[in-house]
């Protein structure tokens, strides 16, 4: 029941996805060959959220892996967890998308998309009650952004009532991979606004900062960053997979976090994050988790929540703890920082508690916030987009694949609309609406 189908697209998506399956397999006591080696009955109780039980008692991830070039997938397949996945679920092209959104969305990706959809259908038919899809991809490249958004829109067409959750890695302000990132990201956001239900915004720079500052890693690798992301991903769905006192699922999350359908871009955070050297000196308490979880330096995207206001937020705690104390801490945060929450949505922080902590910790918490300050990310990408688009720089790569300049203009204005919507709700005050109603009543 309540299965989630996982899709990973492009190099970034596949690398995050690979780590994610390591984390989840570890939690459920499943070894790299797919056999159960755990110790607790709880691990198997709802293992079918992410795994399908195959013949011989093997557990196979409900995962679809796609890319437009074979490289990343080959390294996944030959890696330690390569034999976990179903071989038919690896779908790849040969040419690559060359960091070109148009290739991923219209030409190369469009040729491959039908075979991806076949596998998605096959996996969806294996589910008793599919809850939704989770998609890992980056927005700066070609495959994850172009083909990833193409897949999202196709899945939305076929399964309009299932939740669509994305973990999207945005281009970072300082760490740039390719020059056309702003184009790819803007075109992708244009799609995500329309077709995504919940979008977790991540970016490499913020993750690097967490690794340097908090985890005290001198030379963090992508593996370290991906482990951070995957712990957060597993925290987002722990309530579906383990028993808890206050449960939450993808739909409850959406209902509680999204006040207006277009504003579904969330900041995520995770606590506790401690450097390995100071781990042994630290006792975990709920107040400490709460404090770190709401800390601006703990957010996994380069936007500062202190520059905006929270429309809504959700905290998912894991471990043995009292729900009363959790609620007290949440109320405490809201009372102390009331100026950072919009006052026209009362009780806008949802908390849930799951009894089983992640491997190696006694308790942890995952944070998701719908903050208006996320507009900083979009604003930054939009400025870079405009600088290039004004000069029509590199446009021929996209028009050569059959795209129209009009699409760029549309995507740009959609993103700017999104920024101004966030700004509008940041500035809104509670009593505005009453006056409007009175004016209307008088006119009538």
UniProtKB/Swiss-Prot annotation:
GTP binds at residues 11, 69, 138, 142-144, 204, 226. Its cofactor is Mg(2+). Tubulin is the major constituent of microtubules, a cylinder consisting of laterally associated linear protofilaments composed of alpha- and beta-tubulin heterodimers. Microtubules grow by the addition of GTP-tubulin dimers to the microtubule end, where a stabilizing cap forms. Below the cap, tubulin dimers are in GDP-bound state, owing to GTPase activity of alpha-tubulin. Keywords: Cytoplasm, Cytoskeleton, GTP-binding, Magnesium, Metal-binding, Microtubule, Nucleotide-binding. This is Tubulin beta-7 chain. It is found in: Cytoplasm, Cytoskeleton. Mg(2+) binds at residue 69. PROSITE patterns: TUBULIN (PS00227), TUBULIN_B_AUTOREG (PS00228). InterPro entries: Beta-tubulin_BS, Beta_tubulin, Tub_FtsZ_C, Tubulin, Tubulin/FtsZ-like_C, Tubulin/FtsZ_2-layer-sand-dom, Tubulin/FtsZ_GTPase_sf, Tubulin_C. One of its GO terms (cellular component) is microtubule. It comes from the Eukaryota. CDD domains: beta_tubulin (cd02187). Belongs to the tubulin family. GO terms for biological process: cell growth; microtubule cytoskeleton organization; mitotic cell cycle; seed trichome elongation. Dimer of alpha and beta chains. A typical microtubule is a hollow water-filled tube with an outer diameter of 25 nm and an inner diameter of 15 nM. Alpha-beta heterodimers associate head-to-tail to form protofilaments running lengthwise along the microtubule wall with the beta-tubulin subunit facing the microtubule plus end conferring a structural polarity. Microtubules usually have 13 protofilaments but different protofilament numbers can be found in some organisms and specialized cells. GO terms for molecular function: GTP binding; GTPase activity; metal ion binding; structural constituent of cytoskeleton.
């Amino acid at each position: 029941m309540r299965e989630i189908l996982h899709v990973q697209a492009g190099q970034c998506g596949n690398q995050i996805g690979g780590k994610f399956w390591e984390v989840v397999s570890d939690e459920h006591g499943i070894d790299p060959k797919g056999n159960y080696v755990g110790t607790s009955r709880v691990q198997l109780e709802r293992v079918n959220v992410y795994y399908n039980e195959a013949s011989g008692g093997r557990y196979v991830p409900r995962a679809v892996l796609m890319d437009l070039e074979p490289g990343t997938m080959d390294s996944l397949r030959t890696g330690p967890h390569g034999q976990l996945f179903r071989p038919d679920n690896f779908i790849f092209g040969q040419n690559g998308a060359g960091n070109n959104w148009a290739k991923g969305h219209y030409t190369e990706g469009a040729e491959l998309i039908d075979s991806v959809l076949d596998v998605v259908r096959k996996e969806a038919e294996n589910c008793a009650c599919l809850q939704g899809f989770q998609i890992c991809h980056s927005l700066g490249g070609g495959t994850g952004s172009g083909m990833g958004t193409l897949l999202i829109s196709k899945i939305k067409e076929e399964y309009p009532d299932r939740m669509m959750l994305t973990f999207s890695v945005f281009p970072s302000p300082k760490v740039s991979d390719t020059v056309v990132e702003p184009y790819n990201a803007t075109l992708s956001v244009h799609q995500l606004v329309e077709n995504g239900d919940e979008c977790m915004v991540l970016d490499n720079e913020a993750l690097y900062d967490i690794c340097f500052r908090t985890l005290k890693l001198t030379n963090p690798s992508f593996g370290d960053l991906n482990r951070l992301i995957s712990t957060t991903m597993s925290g987002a769905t722990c309530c579906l997979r383990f028993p808890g006192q206050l449960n939450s699922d993808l739909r409850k999350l959406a209902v509680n976090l999204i006040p207006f359908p277009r504003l579904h871009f969330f900041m995520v955070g995770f606590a506790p994050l401690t450097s390995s050297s100071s781990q042994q000196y630290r006792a975990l308490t709920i107040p400490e988790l709460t404090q770190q979880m709401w800390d601006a330096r703990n957010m996994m995207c380069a936007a500062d929540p202190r520059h905006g206001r929270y429309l809504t937020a959700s905290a998912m705690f894991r471990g043995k703890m009292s729900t009363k104390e959790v609620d007290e801490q949440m109320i405490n945060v809201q009372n102390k920082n009331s100026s950072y929450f919009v006052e026209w949505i009362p009780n806008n922080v949802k908390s849930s508690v799951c009894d089983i902590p992640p491997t190696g910790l006694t308790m942890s918490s995952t944070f998701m916030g719908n903050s208006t300050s996320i507009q900083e990310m979009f604003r930054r990408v939009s400025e870079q987009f405009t600088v290039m688009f004004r000069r029509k720089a590199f446009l021929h790569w996209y028009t050569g694949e059959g795209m129209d300049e009009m699409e760029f203009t549309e995507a740009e204005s959609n993103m700017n609309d999104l920024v101004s919507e966030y700004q509008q709700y940041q500035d809104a005050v509670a009593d505005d609406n009453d006056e409007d109603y009175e004016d209307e009543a008088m006119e009538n």
